[in-house]
Amino acid sequence: DNHILYARLMGYTNEQLYNLSQKIINSEKKARSTNCFFGEAYNVSYTDVYDFCSVKQSLKKWEIELGLHHQELGLPWDQPVPEEMWQKVAEYCDNDVIATEAVFNARKADFVAREILADVAGMTVNDTTNSLTTRIIFGGNKRPQDQFNYRNMGDTTQIYDPNRDLPFTMGEPEFDEFTAFDKKGRPIFPGYKFEGGKSLYRGEEVGEGGYVYAEPGMYGDIALLDIASMHPSSIIAEELFGPEYTKRFQEIKDARVEIKHKNFEKARKMLNGALAKYLTDEGSADALAQALKIAINSVYGLTSANFENPFRDNRNKDNIVAKRGALFMVNLKHEVQKRGFTVAHIKTDSIKIPDAT
């Protein structure tokens, strides 16, 4: 919309605007091209409702969810509209505007979160969540990857055993061969391989996102256990962005935890005091917690994105953040089963155990 509006300001005719619209649509479907975008147009808008919403869905779906009127135009886009139909086109456009305003009102909390992120980052509410989060963590460094850490989690040569060189044994091993760590205390997963775009571990294909497992049946008295902040914790434990930038990310995560626990005084001192002005009352604190949650979720998505961005490490072919959690859940499943329990279901960071004691 920004580019169409900017082109109209430059004097494009309706036909030229249509052709520009088609170029933009086709460039999105294929490789993104710059010959149909105007550099000055991006800041024509005040903000992007779709981008700041924490729930990503089409305007039509929002209309259904919010009980709003949805209007179809029913006219071919590639043909001129007769003058007697112009009113119908105007009503169609009106409906989109009214619906967008309703979505804005329904997602006001998301917009307040966007305002907070923009303020902390020193940018505008028209900047994307990804851009704001990038600035908060990396500052002005556009190529921070030279500080990033990445490793092969199946490399058994990195296993550290403090008792390995002792001239005697320490009795029966406390853990099985799949419970191993390197010198930094990071888990090693013996036998894990990533080949041909597939991850294999302990005789099964793990998948490239969160681990999913199920044993169909009817169960009762089920314990549902969650791993708190699995992906953010993996980023921190792996020191994925290097010492300096991982510390900033950890401060965002820790600040959100402190806010949720009402420890406002401690949270005020984090991120060089940038959060202090939003911790004056519980209402503002809730908005800040939501803003930090959006930023945290944005980071994981960018580490696994297939497009270039400052969080992307070209060595990270197997999505190490999600994979570390997935491999842990595989080990957890085997341990629970070894103790005589049924694992009814695993989904990313949660496990369901019937008749748990």
Q: What kind of region is each of these model predictions?
A:
Residues 57-58, 62-233, 315, 331, ...:
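Conserved "right-hand" nucleotidyltransferase catalytic core of DNA-directed polymerases
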Residues 16-18, 72, 244, 345:
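A generic structural-conservation signal
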Residues 55-56, 76-81, 198-331, 337-339, ...:
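Helical catalytic core of nucleic-acid polymerases
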Residues 17-35, 111-120, 158, 163-164, ...:
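Generic hydrophobic, helix-prone segments enriched in Leu/Val/Ile
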Residues 1-61, 92:
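Conserved DEDDh/DEDDy metal-dependent 3′-5′ exonuclease domain
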